[in-house]
A protein has these predicted regions:
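Short, flexible, glycine-rich and Lys/Arg-enriched loop motifs at helix boundaries
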Residues: 13-19, 71-86, 143-144, 165
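Short internal alpha-helix immediately C-terminal to a glycine-rich phosphate-binding loop
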Residues: 1-41
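Adenosine-nucleotide cofactor-binding segment
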Residues: 40-96
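Alpha-helical segments flanking ligand/cofactor-binding loops in enzyme cores
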Residues: 36-37, 57, 99, 127
Length: 167
């Protein structure tokens, strides 16, 4: 459900298929792995980030086009902005990983943040927001109104359904 809310929020913020790679952090976790499958089902190019190198083949089997290691996405940087890499992101980790995502999002891109396994702090500057117009979308699945829940469950059963659920 949280993965569906994340994908839906990104699409409402302007993410479209063909706009570039979408990063999913914490991709071997529950929300992350389902987000990989949902994004792939919609036709997005998905890059999965994980700390588990042994899970690379599995992540590709559920829809990731590429897999990168967690140390690349959690590295702290003195730079407030880095090379633009991502058309969007589902961040299930938080902390330094979310800071990395914000400084590497494409102009106008968004990150849907739902996790805090990497910590609840956020060491960043306003520069990604005011120079690149990026958006930080908070995802709360606990208090989601029933009308939105129904809409998400419908999407989960249709266009967001990961293909690997059928195997």
């Amino acid at each position: 459900f949280t993965a569906a809310l994340s994908v839906d929020a990104l699409e409402h913020a302007g993410l479209i298929v063909g706009s570039g790679p979408v990063l999913v952090t914490g991709a071997t976790g529950g929300v992350g792995s389902v987000a990989v499958g949902m994004l792939a089902a919609r036709g997005y190019e998905v890059v999965a980030s994980t700390g588990k190198a042994a899970s690379s083949d599995w992540l590709k089997s559920i829809g990731a086009s590429d897999v990168i290691m967690r140390d690349e996405t959690s590295a702290e940087s003195p730079k407030p902005l880095e090379r633009e890499r991502w058309a969007g992101s589902v961040d299930c980790v938080g902390g330094s990983t979310l800071a990395y995502v914000l400084r590497t999002l494409n102009y106008g891109a968004s990150v849907a943040a739902s996790g805090l396994t990497g910590g609840n702090g956020l060491a960043t500057t306003v520069l990604p927001f005011i120079l690149r117009g990026v958006n930080l979308l908070g995802i709360d699945s606990v208090q989601t109104p029933i009308a939105i829940r129904r809409a998400m469950w419908t999407r989960i059963a249709t266009d967001l359904r990961p293909s690997w659920l059928d195997t």
